[in-house]
């Protein structure tokens, strides 16, 4: 899929967010329709994204312009493809955040899981460990800083973060991070 494609084209990134739990947890508990990555500021991702769009059988891709509330550079892409299961067009989103790595622990994980279809030789991605992802998820509950404001129609987003926190608390092994 998309994660495999952006890895195969050599795009330098850190895979984060709820979707990376599909690789970090032995048994994934929920699906997500977006891939969140971090790249270093100044990285020209346009050619990587265009080349990746030709690897997996995407029928279309487009950049979606969204206004952010802060000065952090972000870019968003929508990749459309025909589902091999339903034979209907569906999409996956690529959310790119331009910032330096602030994670204490990064690990390499193979793109492999019972819910993912991959082809050819194994592909690995760099991702924060479970402890760091838990820290990210907890920021969702800091609505006056980086989190999701409560009571503004984002209840489902808050519930997803809470669900992930419950899963991660059962898995973490470093309470000092």
Question: Where do the PLM segments sit?
Answer:
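Catalytic cores of NTP-dependent nucleotidyl/adenyl transfer enzymes across multiple folds
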Residues: 1, 70-177
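Active-site nucleotide-donor binding segment shared across nucleotidyl transfer reactions
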Residues: 3-35, 39-41
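Short, charge-rich binding segments
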Residues: 29-30, 37-40, 68-70, 83-88
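Short, flexible active-site-adjacent loop segments at beta-strand->alpha-helix junctions, enriched
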Residues: 19, 43, 100-102
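Short, conserved acidic/polar surface loops in the N-terminal third of protein domains
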Residues: 25-28, 48-51, 105-108
């Amino acid at each position: 899929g998309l994660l495999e494609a952006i890895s195969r084209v050599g795009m330098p990134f850190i895979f984060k967010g709820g979707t990376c739990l599909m690789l970090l947890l032995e048994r994934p508990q929920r699906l997500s329709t977006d891939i969140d990555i971090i790249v270093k500021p100044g990285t020209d991702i346009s050619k990587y994204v265009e080349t990746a769009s030709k690897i997996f059988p995407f029928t279309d891709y487009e950049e979606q312009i969204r206004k952010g509330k802060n000065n952090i550079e972000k870019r968003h892409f929508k990749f459309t493809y025909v589902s091999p299961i339903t034979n209907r067009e569906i999409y996956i989103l690529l959310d790119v955040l331009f910032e330096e790595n602030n994670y204490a622990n990064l690990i390499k994980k193979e793109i492999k899981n019972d819910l993912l279809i991959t082809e050819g030789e194994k592909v690995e991605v760099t991702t924060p460990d479970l402890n760091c992802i838990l820290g990210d998820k907890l920021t969702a509950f800091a609505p006056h800083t980086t989190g999701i404001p409560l009571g503004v129609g984002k209840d489902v987003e808050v519930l997803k973060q809470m669900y992930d926190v419950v899963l991660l608390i059962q898995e973490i092994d470093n309470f000092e991070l």
